[in-house]
Amino acid sequence: MSVRVPEFKVLPEPADLPEPLPEPAPADLRLETVLGALSDPLRLRIVQKLLLESEQFDHTCGWFGFDRPKSSLTHHFRALREAGVTRQRQYGLERRSHVRVADLDARFPGLLDLVAAWTPDGV
């Protein structure tokens, strides 16, 4: 049985971006840490939505439209960043996120294809 893998978007990095917030280096990405971050259905949905629905290079937590408190979303975005799944940058008072596609594909080929093909259940 084969899995149909949807195409996901990799948008070019704009010029003059702020420096990213602290994150693991590509060589320090650990599969168990990445899978731990992706084990939460909301975080998995965040990554999938970034992969499949992004219209810009990065997005604020409000773009996702989740009916969750901002503090809860902040926790989930931090967990994804600290695991190395997403990169966040501070733009004034807001943080914007995108998936570290090149880094994750290099370390764990096929992982993002599985995330993109995942069917959410009740998130």
PLM region spans:
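Canonical helix-turn-helix DNA-binding module
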Residues: 62-85
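Secondary-structure transition/capping residues
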Residues: 57-58, 75, 115
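Amphipathic alpha-helical dimerization/coiled-coil segments
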Residues: 2-32, 48-53, 90, 100-123
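Helix-centric, low-specificity signal for extended rod-like, repetitive segments
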Residues: 23, 36, 71-74, 88-89
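Short amphipathic alpha-helical "recognition" segments used for binding
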Residues: 11, 72-74, 98
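Short, Lys/Arg-enriched C-terminal cap helix and immediately downstream tail that follows
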Residues: 84-87, 93
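Conserved acidic functional residues
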Residues: 40, 76, 109
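N-terminal helix-turn-helix DNA-binding core of bacterial DNA-binding proteins
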Residues: 32-69, 91-103
